From Swiss-Prot:
Keywords carried by this UniProt record: Cytoplasm, Heme biosynthesis, Metal-binding, Oxidoreductase, Porphyrin biosynthesis
Protein name: Oxygen-dependent coproporphyrinogen-III oxidase
Subunit composition and interactions: Homodimer.
Catalytic activity annotation: coproporphyrinogen III + O2 + 2 H(+) = protoporphyrinogen IX + 2 CO2 + 2 H2O
GO CC, any one term: cytoplasm
RNA-binding among keywords: no
Known cofactor(s): a divalent metal cation
InterPro entries tied to this protein: Coprogen_oxidase_aer (IPR001260), Coprogen_oxidase_aer_sf (IPR036406), Coprogen_oxidase_CS (IPR018375)
Annotated binding of substrate, by residue: S102, N118, T119, R120
Biological source species: Rickettsia peacockii (strain Rustic)
Amino acid sequence: MNIENKEITSSWFTNLRDLLCKEFEKIEEEYAQTKGLKPAKFVRSSWQRNGGGGGVMSLMKGAVFEKVGVNISTVFGKISPEFRNEIPGVELDGKFFATGISLVAHLKSPLIPAMHFNTRYIETSKSWFGGGGDLTPFYPEKNETVKFHAAFKEACDKYDSSYYPKFKKQCDEYFYLKHRKEPRGVGGIFYDYLNNGNFEQDFAFTQDVGKALLSVYPEIVRSKLFLPWTAEQKEYQLIRRGRYVEFNLLYDRGTKFGLMTDGNVEAILMSLPPEVKFN
């Protein structure tokens, strides 16, 4: 396994975590100042994995972000034999290394979309990058959806014109609730097992995906920061959040990978919304 690759990827995910947390705290401050509130801050807690490695959870519950979590982790060791068929390159000895960042934002306002983002680097006897970002509005708006997709398309097009249509399609297919026959949101991009034989290029692309998210999502949040909403709209948001829960518990690869590798349960389930209704 390549030690330098491990270090620079892990360092980037930590840096991106800091940039995202800083920007989200800034949004909370902007809102709090106009409402006479004390701005919320992220609370961090670290955890260690028994088999090797660990991570840091950053969680904020505020007036804008009802719950936003930004997790980073770097874990390594051996995967249990019963799970070795599910991850490429661990079939023989089970050894793995994984580092990444995961972000989920649930907003108080039903007019502001929820958002999920993650990027990761994994080494077994093979190595690859994966990740992406997707938007889940409760009241979709075309301009907003176009803006979100355009940010990721720009990042993709720097590297390969085939990336965006391919990764968009993969996102649409991945974030689909088969049992309900409906998409979870308005999509974005999703990629996995990315290894073009050029680590530097694949890593640069993964960094640009993170930068795209950092540029577009805060802009979307700010555009609706002070819009009024009704109790009926909030009720609808809580019901639709149920779809989020269903997907994460039934289909999400990150949830499954975390549980298979004996990750921190609180960090793995951080993506779940703080309040939800099932009718």
